[in-house]
Amino acid sequence: MLSGGALIADLPTSPLNEEYTITGNETVNGQWYQHYQVGDNGILNIYGEGAMLTVNYGHNYSPTFSGSGIVNVGSDTDFGRLVVTSAGAFEDGWNNIINFTGTINVGYRGDFSISGEFPSHYGTIFSIRNLNIDGTVSVMPSIQNNASYFEVGNLNLSKDGMFTSEIDIQMTGNGVYNIYGNGFSAPRIRISQGESNVINLNGENLLSNIKTIDFQSYGGYLRINAYADNILNGFTFNSNAKLGISVSAGETLIIDNLKIENTNVSNVAIEFYDYTNGSFGIGDSDVWIEGNRLYIPSTDTYVDLIAYDAEGSVLSGIWSLDWDGYTNSFIFNQTVPEPAVFAVVLGGLALFCALRNRRRPRSR
C-alpha cells in the first residue's frame, strides 16, 4: 500500500527502499494520481516469463515514476517488461512523466517501452540519468512529430542492444554515451550545456540511424572518440560551442552534413586530439579553408581548427581540404613545415633584413 493509502497491486509501499522482485503483472495507476518511487536504497527487479510492470500515466504535473535507486528489467536469462503508457490525452503540466535519477538496466531478455499520448513541447518529458541497454528500449508516441525530448544522462548500448526512439534524445550536462552496436535510432541527439559530454563509438557506423547531432544551446561541448570508421549524417553548431574529435590510428570520422544553427553563430571550434592527417572529413559541402579556420559561406561563419599531437602540443601547419572520391567527402590535412624549411625561411629573412639595413641611408 502506498503512503497515500492507495493500493497498487502487490508493490511495496512507495518509496521502495529494499529489494523487491516482480514475477507477475503489476500496475501503477498514475491516471488516478497514484505515483511510484524507487528510493536511494531500493532495487526493483522485473524477472520472469510473465513479469511486467505497467506504468499508466494520465498527467505530467508531477512524475508518475521516479526515484534514485535501481530498476532491473530482465536479465541475460530472465524475461521482463516495463511498459509506460497513457490512458488518454491530457493538458500539458510541463513536468517529466518519468524522472529517474538512478539507474535503469535493461537486460538481454528485457523490454522497456514508452508509448501513449503524451504532450508535445520543446523540452524533456522523460528523464533517466543512467540507462544501460542489453535488450530493447522503444519510444513510440501516439502523435507523430512529437517535439518533446527523452533525456538520458549516461547511456551504455551493447552490441546486441536496441534503442529506438521517435522523439529526440537529449544528452544531459557532462553525460557519457558508450555505443557498441548499431541499434540506436532517433531523429536527433541534442547536446545540452556541459564541459565534458562524450560519445564513444566502439564500432563502425554506429550512428547511421541518427539523423543529426545538434548543440542545443550556447556554450556546448562534445567530444567524439571514434575507435573505428564512422559517418555521422549531420552535425549542427551553435554559438560558443566546441566539438572535440579523437580518431584511432588508421580510422576515419566523417560528418556528411556540417551545419550552423543560424547566421548569428560565432566563437565555434573543432579540436582534434592526437591528430593524424586523413582522419577527419566532411561531406560534399560548400566550404573552404582560410588560414586555420573553416569557412562556411551559407551562414558566413568561421570555425576555428585546432590540432594537438599525442603529447597535447598544438600542431602549427597549413590546413587543406582534399577531395576523396571513395568516401565522397573533403578530407582534412595539415602540412607542418619540416625544420629544414623553417631554417631556410628564417635564413632568408635574416639575409633580407641585413641587406635592407646595409642599403638604408645613414641619417645626417
State where each predicted segment sits:
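Short, charged juxtamembrane terminal tails flanking transmembrane helices
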Residues: R359-R364
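A short, hydrophobic C-terminal helix/tail in secreted or cell-surface proteins
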Residues: E338-R356
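Extracellular/surface-exposed low-complexity segments
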Residues: M1-G30, G102-V106, G203, K242-P337, ...
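Surface-exposed loop/turn positions within long extracellular repeat scaffolds
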Residues: G5, D10-N17, T27-G67, T77-F79, ...
